Amino acid sequence: MRWACRMDELRPGVFVDGAHNEDGIEAFVQSLQLQQELSEEHLHTGRCVVIFSVVSDKQYEPMIRMLCGLTMVTDFVVTQIPGGRGANLSALRGLFEKYMNQRTQKIHTYEKIEDALAFSLSVREDTGRIYIVGSLYLAGLVESMMEDYDDRF
């Protein structure tokens, strides 16, 4: 059996993972760490971008702390889930700033998911990777955007 939105590669180098709680993020982090260990001779030289959003009723501080421990991540792109269920964008940014390595990691915020995705695609470089995590809503919306806007993305 295969679960949708579990490290699905939507386009070359663009992955969506439905990790939306502490256990899911922990599994996602372990998966990325294992990928890095197994492919050290084929390290990706481009940027590693994580697009993140979460619904407001989740315990998201531990999730953000775990994500910030991923040393291969160069950019965190925080965005807003539409419809009022998403966590506050400023609060999310503040937590990333608290836990990320300010020397090697950057934070970017976009209110619209489409803008976050467009920015991420523009900076990742040919050998870079983008990972979309934090919410099943986010995962589903990005999958839909990639299908609907094939020309743009």
Predicted regions, residues:
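Short amphipathic alpha-helical segments
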Residues: 27-29, 63-65, 89-91, 143-146
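Nucleotide phosphate-binding/pyrophosphate-handling subdomain across enzymes
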Residues: 1-75
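C-terminal helical cap/extension that packs against the catalytic core
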Residues: 14-15, 63-129
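Residue-level signal for short, function-critical loop segments
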Residues: 54-56, 80-82, 136
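A general structural signal for well-ordered alpha-helical segments in protein cores
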Residues: 4, 25, 89-92, 113, ...
